[in-house]
């Protein structure tokens, strides 16, 4: 049905997604408006399969579609249950912990403790931080590999859910045709068959003719109930569509956040840490140079003025362009905030999946009850 529509006409199920409408008649009217000639031929063919007074045939009418819907619901439920996003949250928590483990203040001499500066352990401290940063960087690289795997799995899940969404559309189309075919047959019996039977019974007064009319009316009542059951199944398909999209959107948002961490946040953190270490080493180099200049100044009194001037100018030039540590801290805080937002999205996704799982279980039980009642 969908493939034969022109590109500028939306599927009724997509219209429902856009307008969040549960108006059963509106969806049915939209469906009838979009019927192609092939659809009309299929409706006619399906309608002709309904044999009046064939109660067993009526019982089986559309049952294969409903069984497919039951299997389809199982697929979605299994997917929701099997995709535990816990490892994603744990991996992101590990990443955030590693980013916090290296404090920019540790490589800023001005913010070190007085005791540490008193014993002149600045150089040793920087080396220690550099060594720790290398270790953390290696650990972050390993975490990045895990995040890549999680992102790939989330992307595959989105594609799988999209396939399920298309299958749900196909089911919606097929069950809608069965509903229209049954309604067509019902109208035919009410407007043609029953009036003829009533006329015959009125003319003959034969009890068997009267019973035949009553049997046909009873068949119409059962047919009407069968139509209602199929409409319930179609409503399940309508409600399933936004649930699939909800899970898809959460997975997609989480995958995008992971990609942002991998491609932007982590490289930026590494670059900024490397820059900070380089600048701190330059600061130490300037300090050492100043000491050498002072010593030389004492030994060579005749060149004291010139050496002092050169030392000051050199120190001034070397001091230019040093990045503020506060900027580095702000950058790191932004990185951590990004990861925290990702964790929040993951938590929201878990809650939404739990809601979806509960609703799907209820829908499945409802469908099973109708199937069981249909077989009685």
Swiss-Prot record:
Coiled-coil region: none
The organism's place on the tree of life at top rank: Bacteria
InterPro entries: Toxic_anion-R_TelA
Family to which the UniProt record says this protein belongs: Belongs to the TelA family.
Name the record gives this protein: TelA-like protein SERP0976
């Amino acid at each position: 049905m969908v493939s034969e529509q022109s590109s500028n006409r939306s599927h009724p199920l997509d219209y429902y997604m856009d307008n969040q409408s549960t108006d059963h008649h509106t969806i049915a009217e939209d469906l009838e408006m979009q019927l192609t000639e092939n659809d009309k031929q299929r409706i006619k063919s399906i309608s002709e399969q309904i044999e009046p007074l064939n109660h067993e045939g009526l019982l089986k009418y559309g049952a294969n579609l409903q069984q497919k819907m039951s299997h389809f619901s199982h697929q979605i439920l299994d997917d929701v249950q099997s995709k535990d996003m816990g490892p994603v949250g744990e991996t992101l928590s590990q990443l955030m912990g590693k980013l916090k483990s290296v404090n920019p203040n540790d490589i800023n001499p001005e913010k070190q403790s007085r005791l540490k500066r008193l014993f002149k352990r600045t150089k040793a401290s920087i080396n220690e931080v550099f060594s720790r940063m290398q270790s953390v960087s290696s650990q972050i690289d390993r975490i990045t590999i895990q995040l890549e795997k999680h992102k790939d799995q989330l992307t595959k899940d989105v594609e799988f859910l999209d396939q399920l969404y298309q299958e749900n559309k196909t089911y919606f189309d097929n069950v809608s045709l069965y509903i229209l075919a049954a309604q067509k047959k019902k109208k035919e019996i009410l407007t043609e068959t029953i009036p003829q039977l009533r006329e015959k019974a009125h003319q003959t007064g034969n009890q068997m003719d009267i019973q035949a009319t009553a049997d046909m009316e009873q068949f119409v009542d059962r047919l009407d109930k069968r139509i209602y059951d199929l409409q319930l199944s179609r409503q399940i398909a309508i409600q399933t569509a936004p649930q699939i999209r909800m899970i898809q959107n959460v997975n997609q948002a989480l995958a995008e956040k992971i990609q942002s961490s991998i491609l932007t946040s982590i490289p930026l953190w590494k670059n900024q840490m490397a820059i900070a270490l380089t600048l701190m080493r330059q600061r130490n180099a300037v300090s050492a140079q100043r000491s050498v200049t002072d010593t030389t100044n004492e030994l060579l009194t005749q060149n004291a003025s010139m050496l002092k001037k050169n030392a000051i100018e050199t120190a001034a030039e070397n001091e230019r362009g040093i990045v503020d540590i506060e900027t580095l801290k702000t950058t790191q805080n932004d990185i951590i905030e990004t990861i925290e937002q990702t964790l929040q999205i993951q938590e929201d996704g878990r809650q939404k999946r739990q809601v979806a799982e509960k609703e799907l279980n209820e829908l499945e039980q409802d469908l099973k009850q109708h199937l069981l009642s249909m077989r009685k």
